[in-house]
UniProtKB/Swiss-Prot annotation:
Catalytic activity: DNA(n) + a 2'-deoxyribonucleoside 5'-triphosphate = DNA(n+1) + diphosphate
Listed GO CC annotations: alpha DNA polymerase:primase complex; nucleus
GO biological process, one term: DNA replication initiation
Location of the motif CysB motif: 1422-1451
Major enzyme class: transferase
High-level lineage: Eukaryota, Viridiplantae, Streptophyta, Embryophyta, Tracheophyta
Its EC number(s): 2.7.7.7
Protein name listed in UniProt: DNA polymerase alpha catalytic subunit
Subcellular location: Nucleus
Length: 1534
C-alpha cells in the first residue's frame, strides 16, 4: 500500500471512530438544511437565520484526503512558538470534548473550553459556532473601547446569534473578547499594537483586584472612573441577550476613551469633573444615555481649574530647552571639554606646589586602604578647571595616654621647666621627660605588641584637658603621645594600665586628623607639594587627574597675597521614573533624566538668567522598553530627530534596565559633575539606582562611575535606623564619594517652613510653577503611544529642572559653603544637614589650636543599638565606656522609641499669660541671641566653670581669662557685625553674597548652645547647659520685675528670651517711646546682653502659653499690617486646609475690631454655611487633606494601628511608593465606606486614605464629614473663641450641625480656674456648691430598683410649697421617700422595701468607696481638645516651666498638658455632698427659729434613721486631707 492510500485508510478509520456523537451531529445538520431549504416550519422548530453556510459538506474520501493534506502542510501552517508546543498536526478536533492544552498563553473560548485554533481561511469555510457565541458580546466591547479599533468590524449582525444562553454565563472582559477575535487572524500592524497594549496592561499593576462581570445589553453602565484607571483594567457589566435583535451604539459625541497622549495620572480628574461620574445607560431604542451619578462627596480639581494663573513647570522647561540652545552646542562642548586635555598636560604650579581647590574628601575606614584619604577637587590645567583626586597615604594615628600622677611629678616638672630656657622644645628637657616616662613607655610598648603593632613612636607632650570625664585631671599636664599607622588595629577605648589612666583618640578617623591637623576648613585652596602624578592605568579614581602624596605634611592651606579665583563646579540634576514590580515589591527604572549645568558659581548666588543662558545647560534622557514589550511605533524616529536637531544624544532608547543603567553611568562619567542634585535623591533616587545596578548585575567599572572612586565591590546599601536629617546611608555616600550630594528635600526642610516638602508643593509655593505629578502606576499605560512616552520624558526632565531651580532659588551651594568654611567640616556633610557635626568641627579646630585634648567620639555599636543609654545624664561621674552607643557618624541620635528622653534640666522660663483679647498696642521685646550672649556675658566655658561634685548647678566662673567658647562666639559676632555693615552699602549680587555670609555666621553662633545640651553631642556638658539656662531664667525674671516695678508697665506674657508689654495706648508713637525707655533701662545692666524691639501689635488674642495671634505693625513707620500666628492650629501641618481656612476667617473676624455681637454672628453664619457646603459635596478634596510627619520608619511604630498617617504610609510602602521613610510627610483623608452599614465602621486610623486612593476609587470611599466638623473644625474655632463673650463650644457645635450635648464638657477652662482653689465654704447656695456632683443612688432591697436619693432638705422645700398640712396627699417623690423610707415603686405595705438605717449606711459607704477608687485610678487627660490623650501613667518629662508629669506624651505634635480627670477637689466635693444629703441637723440650723418649729419633731424622728449613714460618710470625708489646713506649713517656729 502506498503512502497516500495508507493515509487515506487511516483517515477513514479515524472518521469511523468518531462514533455516535458525530453521527448525531450529521443528522442534526441534515435537519437544519431541510428547514433552511424551505421544509416544514413547525412552531416548535428552531428559527435560525444563516446568512452563509457554517460547514462544508464533503464525502468521506474527500475528508480523508483533506486531513492528509493538512498533516503534510502542518509545519508550514504555523510556527511552533519557540518550542512552547503550539502547532497544528492537521487533525480536526472534536469540539464537544474538553481537552488539555500545553500552552498557557491562550485562554479558553466559550463555556466548553474549546481551544482557539488557527485555520487557513477558505471562502467556503465558516467560523465555528463558538466564535459566534463570543461575538454576541462584542457590540458592548466595541461601545466601550471605541469604534476606531480593529475589533469594531466584528460588531455587525453577522456575528450576533439571537437566543443564545451562553452569553449570560460568559465572564470575559471586553479586552479579552477583542483580543480573542483578533487572534484568529494573521497578525498585522494593528494586531501588534494591540498586543503591545496588552503587555502594557499586564505590566501595570492594579490598585485592587477587578472582577470580570457579565455584560447586560439592556443596561450598559460604563464607569469612567474605572475606565480611566491607571491600571487600564476594564470593568464591564452583565449583558443578556433577548429575543429582539438590539443594536447597541454610543452617541458619536461621547468620548469614552482618553487620548493616548493624555497623562493617565489625571484619570481621577477626568472622571470626577464637577463631582460626578458619567454612567451611560441604554434605553429601549438602543441609544446610550449618559447620566451623572454623584459618588464622592467632595469636588476634585480638574487640570483646567487648577492654578489657572500659575505657569506650567513643563512648559517652563521646554522654553529653557528652546530650539536646541541648551541641548547641545556650547553645553555639549563644555561637557566634553575634557577630551582636549590628557594626562601629559602640565599643571599650573605655584612655587613648585600644585594649587588644589578641595571640594570633598573620603577615607576607607577598613580594609587594605585603611588610613588612606582621598581628596577631590579642582586643578587648573590649560586655563580651565578639571577634576583631580589627591591620594594621601601613610596617615598615622594620634593617641594620648594620660599618665598617673607619679609619672610626671609636679615639682619635678616645675624644676625641669625652670631650668629649661625654651620649655618643652629644649633637648635636655625632652630627654628628661623621656627618662621620667620610661616605665610608661615600656608598658605602652607591651600593649601595642599585644595588638600586633610593630611600628610606632612615642613622645611626651604638654596638653590641656577640660571636659566632662571625672576620672581625668583637668588643666595642663604632660601626656604621652603615640603615633602608629592606620593599617594596624585600633586600641580599645577602655584600655588601662598600671602607669596610665586612659587612652584618648583611639577611634579618631584619619580624615578628621587630616582636616584638624592641616587646618583645612571646608572648600578652599590647598598647596600640594612633593606629589607624584599617577598614570591612567594605575588610577583609583575616575577624575581627569590624579596625584599621590606620601605624607599629610605635604598638604597645607595655600597662603597667597592675591585672592585666587574660586573655580566653578559642574552640577547634574538627576530624576528617575520608576514602575513597581508587584511580585518583588521593588521599583524598577524605566527612564532617567539628567540636566547638567556647567560653570556654576559657589561663592555667590546665581540669577535665573545666568544659569539658564545659552551654553550653560545640557540634558539627556535614557529610556528603556518594558519587559516583554516593544517601543511604540514612531518613537525611534522621534528620538533620532531630536538627537539630530540637538546635535547630541538627548534621548537614548535602550532594550533593558541593565542597558539603561550602563548608558546612564557612561553619560554621567562624561559630564564629570562635581555635584549631584535631586529632590529626595538621598532617600529614593540613589537608593533605587544602586539597588537596581546591584540586581541587574551592572559591572563595577560601570556603577562605580556614579562616584569618583573606582570600586570592585559595592558597599552595603542598607540605611539602618538613623533618624531623618542624616541624609543618605553611609553605603550610598561611599558609592558617590568625590561628588557632592545636594538634596533639595533636605535643604528645604532646613531653610523653609512648609506644610509639605514635596516637589509639587515647593514648586508651587517657592517657584510659582505647577508641576505634573506622575506616579509609578501611571507609567506603564503611557507605553501605548510614542506621544505619551515623549510626555514622560518631558516630565522627567522637568522634575530635574525643578530640583535644579530650587537649589538656585534657595542659594544652597553658597550658603552651605559659607557654613562649611566657618565650621571647618566637610561640605558634603553640611549639605546632608549634619548640624551637630558643624558645631563639633568648629570646636575641634578651636580646641586643637589651643593644644587641648578633645573628647573621644564614640562609634555606634551594633550590640547596643536597641538598648537604653548607658550613661545617665543626671550623673556627672559617668565613665567613658558608659557613653551613649547610639551616636552615629554624623552625631545624630538614633530614635529608640520610648527610651527617647527630653532634657534632664530646666529650660527657659515661660510666664503664665494674662489671657484675653487686647485692643491696645502690645510691645514685643526680645534679647538678641540670648544664650550665646550669656556665654559671653558670664565667660561660661569648659575651661572656666568648676563643676560641682554633687551634680548641682555650678557657680558662675570667677576667672578673668576669657574662655574658648566666649572667644569663639566673640569672633563670630564681630565678623557678622562687620559683614552686616558691608551689607548696608552693597547692592546686587554682592549684597546677596554678604547676606548669605551673615546668615551663616548667625546660624553657627546660635547652634553653639545646642551642642552643650544635646546628650549625644561630642561636647555634651550638662553643667554648662544648666548654668546657661538658669541665667536665662533669672535675666528674664529680672527684666519683668524691672518693667513692672520700676517702669509701672503691665507684662502680659514672657517666653525664654522675650516679654510682651501691654501699653494701653492707641498712639503708636507713644508706644514706641515706651519701648525705647524699656530698652535703655535693661541694656545698661549688661555688657553683652542686648534687648531690642521685635514687634508692635495693634491687636492681640492671647490664648495660652506659646499660643497667640496678633496684628503686627511694620516697624519702619509704614501702614503695612499682617497677622502673625504663633503655636495656633493654623500653623501646624497636622490640621487640614479646611480647618486652617476657617480658623483664619475666625481670627480675622476676632481681630477686625468689630463689635462682639457682629463678630459672633459672622462666625456663626460662616460655620453654618461651611457645614452645608461640606455636606453638599461642594468642598474641594484638597481641603480635607491632613499631613503628618513620620518620626520613624512606619513599621517601627508600636502603636501603628492607632496612627492614621502610619497606616497610610504602610499601605503606600507595601505598594512600592516612595516617601514613606522617617521624616517624610504623609497626606491623608479620614473617610468612611459608602457601602458600609455603619459610616464609622473601624477606627480613625483604619479609615485614613491617601488622596490618590480616593481619586482612584471614588465609588468606594466618601469623606467622613462628621469627623472633620467635630475633630478638625470645632476644636480650632472653639479655642479661638474661648475668650469671646456670646458663644460657647455647644453653640459652635450647633452651628456645625453636631450634637451640642457632647460638647458640654465638665472640664471647663481648667486653665482659667483651678477647681482646687474653689472654697466650698464661700458658696452659700447648695445648688451652686454641689453642681456637677453625682447623686446618691439607692437600690431597693425588695425589687432591686435603683433610684436617686434626694437631700433631706427637700422636706423643707416641699413643705413650703403647701404639702406639709397633708403629707399623704403630696405628689413630690422626694418628700414621700423621706417620710416613707421605701422604694418609690413598691407599695407601703411591703416591709421588704423599707430602707433601714443599716441599708442606707452601707449603700452610701459603697458609693463613697467607688469615688475614692476613681480618684486613685489617677486618669490623666490632655487638655487640648484636638488631642484628648488619656493615660494612667505619669510622664516624667520636663519641658520649660511645666510641672513634672504634665507634658502630653504626644509632644511635640501636641502642646497640651495632662490634667487629672478626677481631682482631690472633685472627691472632697462629692463626699461633702453625701454628707449634705443626710445631714438633717444642718438643715434645721439654717432655718430661723420660727421656721424651724414645724420640722423639729419630724427631723428628730428622721435622725434616728439617717444618723448612722451620716456618721459613716463624715468619717470618710474627714480622712480626706484636702479638707484640712496644716498650720505648721503656714507658720514659722521661733
Amino acid at each position: 500500500m502506498d503512502e497516500g492510500s495508507a493515509d487515506a485508510g487511516a483517515s477513514g478509520r479515524r472518521s469511523r471512530a468518531r462514533g455516535s456523537e458525530a453521527v448525531a451531529r450529521s443528522a442534526a445538520l441534515e435537519r437544519l438544511r431541510a428547514i433552511r431549504d424551505g421544509g416544514a416550519r413547525a412552531a416548535a422548530a428552531v428559527q435560525v437565520r444563516i446568512e452563509a453556510p457554517i460547514y462544508d459538506t464533503v464525502a468521506e474520501e474527500d475528508y480523508a484526503a483533506l486531513v492528509a493534506r493538512r498533516r503534510k502542510d502542518a509545519g508550514a501552517f504555523i510556527v511552533d512558538d519557540d518550542g512552547l508546543g503550539y502547532a497544528d498536526d492537521g487533525r480536526e478536533e472534536d469540539w464537544t470534548h474538553r481537552t488539555i492544552h500545553s500552552s498557557s498563553d491562550e485562554g479558553s473560548d466559550g463555556e466548553d473550553g474549546a481551544p482557539r485554533k488557527r485555520k487557513q481561511p477558505r471562502p467556503q469555510s465558516k467560523r465555528p459556532p463558538q466564535q459566534s457565541a463570543a461575538a454576541a458580546s462584542l457590540s458592548a466591547a466595541a461601545a466601550m473601547m471605541g469604534k476606531q479599533r480593529l475589533s469594531s468590524m466584528f460588531t455587525s449582525s453577522v456575528f450576533r446569534k439571537p437566543g443564545s444562553d451562553r452569553g449570560r454565563d460568559s465572564s470575559l472582559a471586553a479586552d479579552s473578547i477583542v483580543d480573542d477575535v483578533i487572534a484568529e487572524f494573521a497578525p498585522d500592524d494593528n494586531d501588534r499594537e494591540e498586543r503591545r497594549r496588552r503587555v502594557g496592561r499586564v505590566c501595570a499593576p492594579a490598585p485592587a483586584p477587578t472582577t470580570t462581570a457579565h455584560i447586560k445589553a439592556e443596561n450598559v453602565a460604563v464607569d469612567t472612573a474605572m475606565a480611566f484607571r491607571s491600571d487600564n483594567v476594564f470593568e464591564a457589566h452583565e449583558v443578556s441577550d433577548h429575543g429582539n435583535d438590539m443594536d447597541m451604539e454610543l452617541k458619536p459625541d461621547v468620548e469614552m476613551e482618553p487620548k493616548l497622549d493624555t497623562p493617565l495620572g489625571a484619570s481621577a480628574e477626568l472622571a470626577n469633573n464637577s463631582n460626578s461620574l458619567e454612567e451611560p445607560k441604554q434605553e429601549a431604542n438602543g441609544e446610550v444615555k449618559i447620566e451623572k451619578v454623584h459618588r464622592l462627596n467632595a469636588k476634585i480639581k480638574t487640570e483646567d481649574s487648577r492654578n489657572g494663573d500659575m505657569a506650567s513647570a513643563t512648559a517652563g522647561w521646554m522654553k529653557i530647552c528652546g530650539d536646541g540652545d541648551n541641548a547641545g552646542g556650547e553645553g555639549a562642548v563644555a561637557a566634553n571639554s575634557n577630551t582636549g586635555v590628557d594626562e601629559s598636560s602640565e599643571f599650573e604650579l605655584k612655587d613648585g606646589a600644585l594649587p588644589f581647590y578641595i571640594l570633598d574628601a573620603y577615607e576607607e575606614p577598613f580594609g587594605a586602604n585603611s588610613g588612606t584619604v582621598y581628596l577631590f577637587g579642582k586643578v587648573e590645567v590649560g586655563k580651565r578647571f578639571h577634576s583631580c583626586c589627591v591620594v594621601v597615604k601613610n596617615m598615622q594615628r594620634c593617641i594620648y595616654a594620660i599618665p598617673s600622677s607619679s609619672i610626671f611629678p609636679r615639682d619635678t616638672i616645675s624644676r625641669l621647666e625652670k631650668n629649661s630656657t625654651t620649655s618643652d622644645s629644649s633637648p635636655s628637657l625632652r630627654a628628661s621627660l623621656h627618662e621620667l616616662a620610661s616605665g610608661l613607655k615600656s608598658e605602652i610598648a607591651d600593649k601595642l605588641s599585644d595588638f600586633n603593632v610593630s611600628n610606632f613612636a612615642m613622645t611626651p607632650v604638654k596638653r590641656n584637658y577640660a571636659f566632662e570625664r571625672t576620672d581625668l585631671p583637668n588643666g595642663e599636664q604632660y601626656v604621652l603621645k603615640i603615633n602608629y599607622p592606620y593599617k594596624d588595629p585600633a586600641l580599645p577605648t577602655d584600655l588601662r594600665g598600671q602607669h596610665f589612666h586612659a587612652l584618648l583618640g583611639t577611634n579618631n578617623s584619619a580624615l578628621e586628623l587630616l582636616l584638624i591637623k592641616r587646618k583645612i576648613k571646608g572648600p578652599s585652596w590647598l598647596s600640594i607639594s612633593k606629589f607624584l602624578a599617577c598614570p591612567a592605568t594605575q588610577r583609583v579614581s575616575w577624575c581627569k587627574f590624579e596625584v599621590t602624596v606620601d605624607s599629610p605634611k605635604d598638604i597645607s592651606v595655600l597662603m597667597t597675597s592675591t585672592t585666587l579665583e574660586v573655580p566653578p563646579v559642574v552640577v547634574a540634576a538627576v530624576n528617575l521614573k520608576t514602575i513597581i514590580n508587584e511580585k518583588h515589591n521593588v521599583h524598577e527604572i524605566v527612564s532617567a533624566s539628567v540636566i547638567c549645568c556647567h560653570r556654576v558659581k559657589i561663592d555667590s548666588p546665581m540669577r535665573s538668567e545666568d544659569w539658564q543662558k545659552r551654553g550653560m545647560l545640557s540634558h539627556f534622557t535614557v529610556m528603556r522598553k518594558l519587559e516583554g514589550s516593544i517601543f511604540p511605533i514612531g518613537l525611534s524616529k522621534e528620538s533620532s530627530d531630536r538627537n539630530q536637531k540637538a546635535g547630541s544624544n538627548v534621548l537614548a532608547l535602550e532594550s533593558s534596565e541593565r542597558a539603561l543603567l550602563n548608558r546612564l553611568m557612561i553619560e554621567l562619567s562624561k559630564l564629570d559633575c562635581d555635584v549631584l542634585v535631586g529632590h529626595n535623591i538621598s532617600g529614593f533616587d540613589l537608593d533605587v539606582l544602586l539597588h537596581r545596578a546591584q540586581t541587574c548585575k551592572v559591572p563595577s567599572n560601570m556603577w562605580s562611575k556614579i562616584g569618583r572612586l573606582r570600586r570592585s565591590v559595592m558597599p552595603r546599601l542598607t540605611k539602618g535606623n538613623t533618624l531623618y536629617g542624616s541624609g543618605a546611608s553611609p553605603g550610598i555616600m561611599s558609592c558617590i564619594a568625590g561628588r557632592l550630594l545636594c538634596d533639595t528635600y533636605l535643604c528645604s526642610r532646613d531653610l523653609l517652613k512648609e506644610v509639605s516638602y514635596s516637589l509639587t508643593q515647593l514648586a508651587e509655593t517657592q517657584l510659582k510653577k505647577e508641576r505634573k505629578e506622575v506616579s509609578p502606576h501611571d507609567i506603564p499605560p503611557m507605553f501605548q503611544s510614542s506621544g505619551a512616552l515623549l510626555k514622560l520624558v518631558e516630565y522627567g526632565e522637568t522634575d530635574a529642572c525643578l530640583a535644579l531651580e530650587l537649589m538656585f532659588h534657595l542659594s544652597v551651594l553658597p550658603l552651605t559653603r559659607q557654613l562649611t568654611n566657618i565650621s571647618g567640616n566637610l561640605w558634603g556633610k553640611t549639605l546632608q544637614g549634619s548640624r551637630a557635626q558643624r558645631v563639633e568641627y568648629l570646636l575641634l579646630h578651636a580646641f586643637h589650636a589651643r593644644k587641648f585634648i578633645v573628647p573621644d567620639k564614640f562609634a555606634r555599636s551594633k550590640e547596643f543599638n536597641s538598648t537604653k543609654r548607658k550613661m545617665n545624664p543626671d550623673t556627672e561621674a559617668a565613665r567613658p565606656d558608659e557613653a551613649d552607643p547610639s551616636i552615629d557618624d554624623e552625631g545624630h541620635h538614633v530614635d529608640q522609641g520610648k527610651t527617647k528622653k527630653g532634657p534632664s534640666y530646666a529650660g527657659g522660663l515661660v510666664l503664665e499669660p494674662k489671657k484675653g483679647l487686647y485692643d491696645k498696642y502690645v510691645l514685643l521685646l526680645d534679647f538678641n541671641s540670648l544664650y550665646p550672649s550669656i556665654i559671653q556675658e558670664y565667660n561660661i566655658c569648659f575651661t572656666t566653670v568648676d563643676r560641682s561634685a554633687d551634680g548641682n548647678v555650678p557657680n558662675l566662673p570667677a576667672s578673668k581669662t576669657t574662655g574658648v567658647l566666649p572667644e569663639l562666639l566673640k569672633s563670630l559676632v564681630e565678623r557678622r557685625r562687620m559683614v552686616k555693615s558691608w551689607l548696608k552699602t552693597a547692592s546686587g549680587l554682592k549684597r546677596q553674597q554678604f547676606d548669605i555670609q551673615q546668615q551663616a555666621l548667625k546660624l553657627t553662633a546660635n547652634s553653639m548652645y545646642g551642642c552643650l545640651g544635646f546628650s549625644n553631642s561630642r561636647f555634651y556638658a550638662k553643667p554648662l547647659a544648666e548654668l546657661i539656662t538658669l541665667q536665662g531664667r533669672e535675666i528674664l525674671q529680672n527684666t519683668v520685675d524691672l518693667v513692672q516695678n520700676n517702669l509701672n508697665l503691665e507684662v502680659i506674657y514672657g517666653d525664654t528670651d522675650s516679654i510682651m508689654i501691654h501699653t494701653g495706648l492707641d498712639d503708636i508713637s507713644r508706644a514706641k517711646g515706651i519701648a525705647g525707655k524699656v530698652i535703655q533701662e535693661v541694656n545698661k545692666k549688661y555688657r553683652c546682653l542686648e534687648i531690642d524691639l521685635d514687634g508692635i501689635y495693634k491687636r492681640m488674642l492671647l490664648l495660652k502659653k506659646k499660643k497667640y495671634a496678633a496684628i503686627k505693625v511694620a516697624l519702619d513707620g509704614s501702614l503695612r499690617e499682617n497677622i502673625e500666628r504663633k503655636g495656633l492650629d493654623m500653623v501646624r501641618r497636622d490640621w487640614s486646609l479646611l480647618s486652617k481656612e476657617i480658623g483664619d476667617f475666625c481670627l480675622n473676624q476676632i481681630l477686625s475690631g468689630g463689635s462682639c455681637d457682629d463678630v459672633i454672628e459672622s462666625i456663626h453664619s460662616s460655620l453654618v454655611q461651611v457645614q452645608e457646603q461640606m455636606r453638599g459635596g461642594q468642598t474641594e478634596l484638597e481641603k480635607y487633606i491632613i499631613t503628618k510627619s513620620l518620626t520613624k520608619a512606619p513599621e517601627d511604630y508600636p502603636d501603628a494601628k492607632n496612627q492614621p498617617h502610619v497606616q497610610v504610609a504602610l499601605r503606600l510602602k507595601q505598594n512600592g511608593y516612595s516617601g514613606c521613610s522617617a521624616g517624610d510627610t504623609v497626606p491623608y483623608i479620614i473617610c468612611s465606606q459608602q457601602d458600609s452599614e455603619s459610616t464609622h465602621s473601624g477606627g480613625i486610623a483604619q479609615r485614613a486614605r491617601h488622596p490618590e486612593e480616593l481619586k482612584r476609587n471614588p465609588d468606594k470611599w466618601m469623606i467622613d464629614i462628621d469627623y472633620y466638623l467635630s475633630q478638625q473644625i470645632h476644636p480650632v474655632v472653639s479655642r479661638l473663641c474661648a475668650s469671646i463673650q456670646g458663644t460657647s463650644p455647644a453653640r459652635l457645635a450647633e452651628c456645625l450641625g453636631l450634637d451640642s450635648s457632647k460638647f458640654q464638657s465638665r472640664l471647663t477652662e481648667s486653665d482659667n480656674q483651678d477647681t482646687s482653689s474653689m472654697l466650698l465654704s464661700v458658696i452659700d447656695d447648695e445648688d451652686e456648691r454641689y453642681r456637677g456632683c453625682e447623686p446618691l443612688r439607692l437600690s431597693c432591697p425588695s425589687c432591686s430598683t435603683t433610684f436617686d436619693c434626694p437631700p433631706v432638705s427637700s422636706l423643707i422645700i416641699g413643705s413650703s410649697s403647701g404639702n406639709v398640712s397633708n403629707p399623704n396627699e403630696g405628689n413630690d417623690a422626694s418628700i414621700n421617700f423621706w417620710r416613707r423610707m421605701r422604694c418609690p415603686r413598691c407599695p407601703d405595705d411591703t416591709d421588704e422595701s423599707r430602707v433601714s438605717p443599716a441599708v442606707l449606711a452601707n449603700q452610701m459607704k459603697r458609693q463613697a468607696d467607688s469615688f475614692i477608687n476613681l480618684y486613685y485610678k489617677g486618669l490623666l487627660m490632655c487638655d487640648d481638645e484636638g488631642c484628648k490623650y488619656s493615660t494612667h501613667s505619669v510622664n516624667l518629662r520636663v519641658m520649660g516651666d511645666s510641672e513634672r508629669g504634665t507634658i502630653c506624651p504626644n509632644y511635640p505634635r501636641c502642646n497640651g498638658h495632662l490634667v487629672r480627670q478626677y481631682t482631690e477637689a472633685d472627691l472632697y466635693r462629692q463626699l461633702s455632698y453625701f454628707c449634705y444629703v443626710v445631714d438633717a441637723t444642718r438643715c434645721l440650723e439654717k432655718l430661723d427659729q420660727k421656721a424651724r418649729l414645724p420640722f423639729e419633731k419630724e427631723f428628730a424622728a428622721l435622725s434616728q434613721t439617717i444618723n448612722l449613714a451620716l456618721m459613716e460618710v463624715q468619717k470618710i470625708r474627714d480622712r480626706c486631707a484636702f479638707g484640712w489646713v496644716q498650720l505648721k506649713d503656714l507658720a514659722i517656729s521661733i
